[in-house]
Amino acid sequence: MEKGPVSQFITHHYRHFNAAALIDAAKGYEAHIDAGGKMMITLGGAMSTAELGISLAEMIRRDKVQIITCTGANLEEDIMNLVAHSHYKRVPHYRDLTPQDEWNLLENHMNRVTDTCIPEEEAFRRLQGHIFKIWKDADDKGERYLPYEFMYKLLRSGELEQYYEIDPKNSWMLAACEKNIPIIVPGWEDSTMGNIFTSYVIKGELKASTVKGGIETMIFLTEWYRANSGGKGVGFFQIAGGISGDFPICVVPMMYQDLEWEDTPCWAYFCQISDSTTSYGSYSGAVPNEKITWGKLPPDTPKFIVESDATIVAPLIFAYVLGW
């Protein structure tokens, strides 16, 4: 495949240091997929609010990723951007805000993520009304699902289409739903929808067990990895740090150490994009080789780390893999 202008630009200019690491990681990703391998992408930080979906959705459609792990915030915020985009407010001078300015944003029901404010009413509450019906229907029937399965039900219901404010092709959740790829969401409770669900449980309107939790999520991931790690194996492309990376990478040592499935393949490719620097006790900032000692990566797995802003780096790597 002949590369497009973005790929040609970074290949020509990104020759050394962190820039070269970006190219190496992109070429490694492409080689793994071209050889028949599969890829997990993990999303930490505020990648959905950063509108990574513009490139990630195409990665999903083009079969460059087979499974995603993300925080509960990233699961919901892509859909929030889909239905409330025009109500978001950008605050480019956010560093100059006083505590009173921040309070005024709250009073206006705007929740800030760096330079972007998410509108409570149009984003959170708009989803709440529709997702509650889906939770309640499952609860009444005694059915139980993982967090992403409920979100897929919401998207497939068509209830949100009346609110769409961006081109649907730029929503990675819609692309994932159309492909029906699994999404691992560890710690879903730490999200707006997780908090809202909890409030209904406290009020006695829903049962906590209706949404499957962390142990069942790990079991689901174990079954998926067992079924998909043959051949060229599964790669691990980690965007930012935190639980979205920490949780899924542990499935490998759990399978061969705790389950004693000694034929379990290790991750076949590893890349992390993070601005968390190496420091004493920092897991997110640890170099990939540290993971060898935990049985997550073998010595011969291609390993890359790009220490930079993921909102800049990830779209460039995706562009290279897509041939843009």
Regions found by a protein language model. Name each.
Residues 51-54, 79-85, 195-199, 248-252, ...:
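Short acidic, glycine/serine/threonine-rich loops at helix termini
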Residues 101-192:
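Ligand-binding beta-strand-loop-alpha-helix segment within the catalytic cores
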Residues 74-78, 191-192, 277-280:
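Short gly/pro/ser/thr-enriched loop/turn and capping motifs at secondary-structure boundaries
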Residues 6, 17-20, 233, 243, ...:
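C-terminal functional extensions of proteins
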Residues 39-48, 68, 184-188, 208-283:
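Glycine-rich anion-binding loop/nest that anchors nucleotide
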Residues 1-26, 30-33:
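N-terminal glycine-rich anion-binding loop in soluble enzyme alpha/beta folds
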Residues 25-39, 175-179, 223-233:
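Glycine-rich phosphate/diphosphate-binding loops that line cofactor/substrate pockets in enzymes
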